[in-house]
């Protein structure tokens, strides 16, 4: 049976919803799944999204079942109406009646929510996303609930706490001569800097985080909210061109060393990891990031497994160790050190984190009882003398930004990221690279030139700091907070992996880990995937190419369309190697003026259809390279 194109690109047969364009005059928006995205005036993005969202008690998304959708296109307006039904994990139902009106200079999104019985939720209502590119650091005016006005700026570096609270309206200059006011009605709104989670937006949301959650919407009681966007044109404005432009890439040399590539190991995948241990050496990974959690029952057997994997692969070992912090720290860490010694495992480095820090502490909440990080780090250094110590967070930058590790005790700082905390659609996942640039920039401002490691970071979520569990995804859908994501297994995952490495390259990361060895976060295909079971997934080749370039003199690849194509390069032994990823479902053509003989390797749909065999370099004379949907290219210039 011939695999479908969508399956090869995304690892799933589930199509993304087709957006419905709503427009009046020069104001337009896309309606997808009952929510608005890409709200533009005269071709310029004004808001990234306006969404009517419902979260369950664990911050998981309750998907909306949309019915009775109608769209009326009138001379001066476009009006959409629909009914939505949200279902909680316990079966409770929240019904919503929504109306969206688009005028030439205004947009109104009105929603009325009514539960059939008491409905437990962490959040129910509107979320408004302002874009970050061209907006970060720009002036903004905030009107508060009491009528007072605050003149400020959108945060430049990522703000750990809410930059604005008690918001009634937000006004900013979209482009010269155009102001946009977004007014929220029906509840108390505040803003968070969603770049903390690598979302490409500032989010204004309903219900302050300082209030208790989850909370209950009472049976039969209707909650009414509305968002009103108003455009004020102060001067004549030309329409912004939105047609694709040719992508010319330029190279910037001497960008420092590219990072070593790490691979994550997990005790719950020990059996499969032993079977695939040889793949680590083939890939060229130089570090094993070994997850060790005594609270999850990890002990001597897990450490012996890590030693066996290190012996087979020849890679250096970092023990990613949760510290229970229930007994004296010297006792707990001394016991772990004895087990490590008895196992014969030699540590190249050790990273520690209090177990309670795996869960996020939202703004306004009480911090859980925990020894000071200084004490944890000192105890780790006593238990493991001479072993370089890392710290930070095993969760995400959000938690590191809010609870900053004392760097004076650390040999390096570390954190992970995840692109599907809030949204899991293809566009949002690829837009996370806009924010990832600011994540690494913020880390460098906080920690200076301290050695810096990232990962394991994958599309799927390996732990949920915001609830009791991650989301199971047996049907292979695009689900926020899912513990497996089908796109990891397909071309999309390969493109995402390269784009991640390209985005963080400027931060001169020491070790970058973007995969585990086995399982849903790993390198090896299971049944029902775009490549044959037991074969390397497409991202394996990307990571192997990155490993080949690690330690080489980095080359930055600059384009005018970083939302469409990203890449990096290095020069080794007189050969320039460039890696490029297409972040879109459309073919993209890049033009490279660099002189020299060229060879091209391409991971694309055709490569998958031909069996995903070892990619072969072929001569490529043209300065143009066509990147099919979500393709990854390796260009060698001799």
Regions found by a protein language model. Give the residues of each.
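Aromatic/acidic polysaccharide-binding cleft in carbohydrate-active enzymes
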Residues: 220, 454-542, 557-560, 565
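Polysaccharide-binding surfaces and accessory modules of carbohydrate-active proteins
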Residues: 105-189, 603-611
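Catalytic domains of carbohydrate-active enzymes, especially glycoside hydrolases
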Residues: 264-297, 305, 309-313
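Extended, loop-rich substrate-binding clefts of extracytoplasmic carbohydrate-active enzymes
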Residues: 54-110, 192-194, 198-201
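Beta-strand-rich recognition/accessory modules
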Residues: 48-53, 87-90, 171-248, 291
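C-terminal beta-strand-rich structural cap/linker in extracellular carbohydrate-active enzymes
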Residues: 615-638
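Carbohydrate-binding surface patches
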Residues: 560-595, 603-605
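Acidic-aromatic substrate-binding/catalytic surfaces of carbohydrate-active enzymes
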Residues: 2-83, 139, 285, 289
């Amino acid at each position: 049976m011939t695999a479908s194109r969508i399956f090869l690109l995304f690892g799933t047969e589930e199509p993304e919803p087709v957006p419905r364009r709503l427009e009046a005059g020069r104001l337009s928006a896309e309606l997808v799944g009952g929510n608005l995205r890409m709200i533009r005036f005269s071709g310029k993005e004004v808001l990234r999204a306006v969404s009517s969202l419902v979260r369950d008690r664990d911050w998981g998304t309750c998907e909306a079942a949309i019915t009775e959708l109608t769209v009326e296109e009138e001379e001066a307006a476009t009006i959409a109406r629909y009914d939505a039904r949200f279902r909680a994990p316990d079966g409770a139902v929240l019904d919503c009646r929504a109306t969206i009106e688009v005028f030439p200079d205004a947009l109104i999104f009105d929603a009325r929510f009514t539960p059939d019985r008491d409905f437990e939720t962490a959040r129910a209502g509107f979320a408004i996303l302002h874009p970050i590119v061209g907006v970060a650091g720009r002036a903004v005016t905030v009107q508060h609930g009491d009528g007072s006005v605050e003149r400020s700026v959108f945060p430049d570096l990522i703000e750990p706490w809410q930059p604005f609270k008690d918001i009634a309206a937000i006004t900013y200059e979209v482009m010269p001569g155009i102001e946009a006011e977004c007014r929220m009605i029906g509840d108390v709104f505040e803003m968070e800097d969603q770049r903390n989670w690598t979302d490409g937006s500032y989010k204004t949301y309903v219900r302050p985080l300082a209030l208790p959650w989850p909370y209950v919407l009472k049976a039969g009681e209707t909650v009414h909210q509305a968002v009103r966007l108003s455009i004020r044109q102060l001067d004549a404005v030309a329409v912004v061109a939105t047609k694709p432009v040719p992508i010319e890439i330029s190279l910037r040399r001497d960008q420092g060393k590219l990072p070593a590539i790490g691979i994550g190991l997990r005790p719950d995948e020990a059996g499969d990891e032993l079977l695939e241990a040889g793949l680590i050496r083939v890939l060229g990974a130089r570090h094993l990031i070994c997850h060790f959690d005594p609270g999850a029952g990890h002990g001597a057997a897990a450490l012996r497994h890590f030693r066996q994997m290190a012996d087979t692969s020849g890679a250096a070992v970092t023990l990613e160790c949760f510290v229970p912090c229930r007994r004296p720290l010297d006792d707990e860490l001394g016991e772990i050190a004895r087990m490590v010694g008895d196992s014969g495992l030699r540590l190249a480095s050790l990273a520690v984190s209090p177990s309670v820090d795996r869960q996020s502490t939202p703004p306004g909440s009480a911090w859980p009882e925990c020894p000071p990080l200084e004490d944890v780090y000192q105890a780790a250094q006593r238990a493991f003398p001479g072993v370089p110590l890392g710290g930070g967070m095993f969760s995400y930058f959000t938690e590191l930004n809010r609870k900053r590790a004392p760097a004076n005790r650390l040999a390096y700082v570390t954190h992970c990221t995840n692109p599907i905390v809030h949204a899991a659609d293809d566009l949002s996942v690829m837009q996370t690279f806009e924010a990832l640039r600011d994540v690494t920039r913020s880390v460098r401002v906080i920690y200076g030139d301290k050695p810096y490691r990232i990962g394991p970071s994958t599309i799927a979520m390996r732990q949920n700091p915001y609830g009791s569990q991650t989301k199971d995804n047996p049907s292979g859908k695009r689900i926020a907070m899912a513990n497996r994501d089908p796109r990891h297994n397909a071309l999309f995952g390969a493109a995402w992996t390269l784009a991640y490495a390209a985005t963080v390259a400027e931060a001169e990361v020491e070790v970058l880990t973007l995969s585990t060895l086995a399982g849903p976060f790993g390198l090896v295909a299971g049944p029902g995937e775009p490549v044959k079971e037991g074969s390397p997934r497409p991202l394996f080749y990307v990571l192997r190419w990155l490993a080949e370039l690690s330690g080489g003199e980095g080359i930055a690849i600059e384009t005018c369309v970083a939302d469409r194509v990203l890449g990096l390069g290095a020069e080794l032994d007189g050969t320039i190697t460039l890696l490029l990823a297409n972040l879109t479902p459309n073919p993209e053509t890049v033009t490279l003026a660099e002189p020299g003989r060229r060879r091209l390797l391409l991971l694309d749909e055709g490569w998958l259809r031909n069996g995903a065999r070892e990619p072969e370099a072929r001569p490529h004379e043209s300065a143009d390279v066509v990147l099919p949907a979500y393709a990854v290219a390796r260009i060698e210039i001799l």
